[in-house]
Amino acid sequence: HLANLPIYYEYKEDGITSTDAIKGTYLDNFKNLFDLYITDSTCEPSLLSSKTIDDANAEFGLGEAVFYQNGTWAYDNIKDNEVADEDMGMLPIYIGVDGEEDQGLCTGSENYWCVNKKADEKDIQATLDFLSWVITSDEGRESISQEMGFTTPFKTFDENYESANPLVKAADEYVKAGKTPVSWNFTTMPSEEWKNQVGSAMLEYAQG
C-alpha cells in the first residue's frame, strides 16, 4: 500500500493511468517516508520481520503507537481498547510533493463483488438475491454499518444506517473539505509476486 504513493504521483504528473515501466520519479520521496517508518517504529529495524498485524493492532489500541497505517475496515480490530473513539482520526500519507496540502486519503478497493456468469442460473440468481439482501434489508444494513463499521456508499443506506465507525466519519470530513483522494493503482502492478518481491526488498533494506 505504501508503494502506491510514488506510483500515484508519477501517473498524475504524466497524465496516465498505467504504464509498462515506471520511471521512479518519486522513489526518493518513497525512500524518505519509509526511512521515517523505520526510525520511528515501535521496535528495532532488525525485529520488523517478526512483527504481525496483530502486534500493530494491539500497539495502537493500547496507545503504544501514535500512528498506524490501515484503513477504515480496521476499526473492529482496535475498538473497545485504551484509545477512545474520539481520540482516533485519519491523516493522508504525505511524501513531500508540491501541492499535497490539498491531498486527501488513499481511497478505493482492490476487492469487488463479482458474480460468475458461467455458474448455474439458479446460483447466479441466489447470489444476486443475497447481495441485494445485504444492502437493502434491515439486518444486512445494520450488520455492514454498525457491526462491521464499513463505509456505506449505497443509495439504500440513509441516515438511519450511517456507519458508527469514527474512522469512516474522519474520512468523510476530507471529502466534505474538497480534498483530492489518492487512487489505489494495484491493478496496474505486474503481479502479486511483484508486490511480494517489493516487500522483501523493503524488509531487506530495513534490516540493513
How would you label these PLM feature ranges?
Residues 62-70, 86:
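Alpha-to-beta junction loops
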Residues 53, 70-75, 109-111:
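Beta->alpha turn/N-cap motifs
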Residues 47-62:
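Short helix-initiation/N-cap motifs at beta->coil->alpha
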Residues 18-50:
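Glycine-centered hinge/linker elements that transmit conformational signals in sensory
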Residues 107, 150-156, 169-208:
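C-terminal capping/gating helix-and-loop segments adjacent to ligand/active sites or protein-protein/ligand interfaces
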Residues 1-22, 65:
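Extracytoplasmic/periplasmic solute-binding protein
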Residues 1, 55-58, 75-81:
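Pocket-flanking alpha-helical
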Residues 40-42, 81-148, 200:
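Extracytoplasmic/periplasmic substrate-recognition and gating elements
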